Design a protein with these regions (language model features):
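Soluble, non-transmembrane catalytic domains of enzymes that act on hydrophobic metabolites at membranes
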Residues: 1-6, 358-360
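Helix-enriched interaction subdomains in cytosolic or periplasmic regions
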Residues: 12-35
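Soluble catalytic domains of membrane acyltransferases
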Residues: 21, 25-26, 38-212, 229-230, ...
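Short, structured interface segments
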Residues: 210-225
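Cys/His-rich short segments
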Residues: 231, 236-290
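Long, charge-rich boundary regions
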Residues: 275-354, 361-363
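Low-complexity, glycine/alanine/valine/leucine- and proline-rich hydrophobic stretches
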Residues: 352, 359-393
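Canonical phosphoinositide-binding patch of PH/PH-like domains
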Residues: 393-413
Length: 442
């Protein structure tokens, strides 16, 4: 009876309002963000201000290339003392350790890669009130050290609101807060803010031109960047931890059996492997090894293989066993290490017809079928060991028993979308992967 009277977490979120953060809580947030050894200072950030947003009058957007879980600290500090409302993933509002802060500093929820009417309502209200809004048009943090293409419709979105847009370029944040390891690896982070668009710029440019320009300025590879910067990151001798979730395929023998231990990434079948040091150098175990120079290049190699395989085989299919998790109905998630609560298991399959799951949820039969027109990539907030999808507006986490399935499923989804729909287009820097296909740019 008690639960019938109590609002669900989703109902509470859907009934929320957002306003300017109270000075008291904003001051506390500022204090926390500057605490040494705990928050931003321990990552040794360097801030460079080309155009000071604090001189801007009226509402504005601040966008940034989303590199890591810690980006909010660097955005907070480079924009200060100006107050703002940050946009964060809807599922993050279900976590107890984040929810209290989100409520105090007035964070706006947004469901990743799907329509969200609550978000539009809250955003419109705050812009009318003259607020500064910070968000990443990529929709989630970097998965393997490079930027993702921005969410389709970003150009139209910015033109619609017609307010100035500032850009914060981050470098080193991915290597600091790596996707394969939930423990931070402090080194150095660089943040630079500049004005990207004035109101007049947005009026003059087409949505397509805006998106092309943002994708261009966002193009960045933290691994390539550090080959020149040569910054040492504190990997604790575990630089390869869980890296098999993304680097799953051996570049030498082609087997999808890569294993990782501490700072070693290796194929158990042919012995091909490497060690990874604190500079994220991939060092072959011996002269016979065939090793990409970074994780980003490794994934690029795997993407090229997937592009060929799905075009070659009209009956292509990939399946794996997994658990699934969802959000508790009446409680927030208390365990910081979990993005959901396990509620069932089954088989996840990807083929030319879409994404499919058959199994159980809360003890009952459960299945879904999704089109690549709707799902073009995965939500991957915390780590690369799991991923999430929205089913009827509700986040469902997929937890493969073999985490090597994550990286492969991600690439299959993205490239099946491009093969069959191509709304979320690839970036120009990987044009060469599509040579000889229908997506080759002549």
């Amino acid at each position: 009876m008690k639960n019938k009277e109590k609002k669900t977490v989703a109902e509470v979120i859907n009934s929320m309002s957002v306003k300017e953060p109270h000075w008291f809580w904003w001051a506390g947030y500022t204090f926390l963000a500057h605490l040494p050894f705990i928050f931003a200072p321990k990552y040794h950030p360097t801030y460079k201000i080309i155009d000071d947003i604090n001189k801007e009058k009226g509402p504005a957007f601040v966008i940034w290339n989303h590199q890591s879980r810690r980006d909010y600290l660097f955005i907070k500090n480079i924009v200060e003392p100006r107050k703002f409302n940050m946009i964060a993933g809807y599922s993050e509002f279900h976590k107890k350790h984040l929810r209290w802060l989100f409520d105090k500093v007035q964070v706006i929820p947004k469901k990743n890669f799907t329509q969200d009417f609550l978000f539009i309502k809250l955003l419109g209200k705050r812009i009318k009130e003259g607020a500064t809004i910070t968000f990443s048009p990529e929709g989630m943090p970097s998965i393997y050290g490079t930027n993702q293409p921005i969410v389709p419709g970003t150009g139209k979105f910015l033109k619609h609101y017609g307010i100035p847009v500032y850009f914060v370029k981050l470098e080193g944040a991915y290597l600091t807060s790596h996707k394969t390891d939930t423990k931070d690896r402090p080194g150095k982070v660089f943040a630079t803010i500049s004005k990207l668009y004035s109101k007049e710029d947005l009026e003059r440019l087409t949505p397509e031109e805006i998106e092309e320009q943002i994708n261009t300025i966002f193009t960045h590879d933290d691994y390539e960047w550090n080959k020149k910067a040569r910054i040492k990151y504190k990997t604790r001798g575990e630089a390869a931890k869980n890296m098999r979730s993304l680097a799953y395929k051996c570049p030498k023998c082609g087997k999808e059996m890569m294993i990782d231990q501490d700072n070693i990434l290796k194929c158990p079948d042919c012995g091909n492997g490497c060690t990874i040091n604190d500079y994220y150098d991939f060092i072959p175990l011996d002269d016979s090894c065939v090793i990409p120079e970074s994780l980003s290049k490794w994934v690029e190699f795997e993407r090229g293989e997937i592009i060929k395989e799905i075009r070659k085989d009209p009956n292509y299919s990939f399946s794996f066993k997994c658990q699934i998790g969802d959000m508790p109905k009446y409680e927030l998630i208390k365990d910081k290490k979990n993005d959901s609560v396990t509620c069932g298991e089954g088989t996840f399959t990807l083929d030319h017809n879409g994404l499919h799951f058959v199994g159980t949820r809360h003890g009952e039969e459960f299945k879904f079928d999704l089109s690549y027109q709707i799902v073009y990539t995965f939500v991957m907030e915390e780590s690369s060991s799991t991923f999430s999808l929205y089913i009827n507006g509700e986040p469902i986490e997929i937890k493969p028993f073999d985490i090597r399935s994550v990286g492969k499923a991600l690439l299959i989804t993205e490239e099946m979308h491009r093969l069959h729909f191509n709304i979320w287009k690839h970036l120009p820097n990987i044009d060469y992967l599509y040579k000889g296909t229908e997506l080759e740019k002549k």
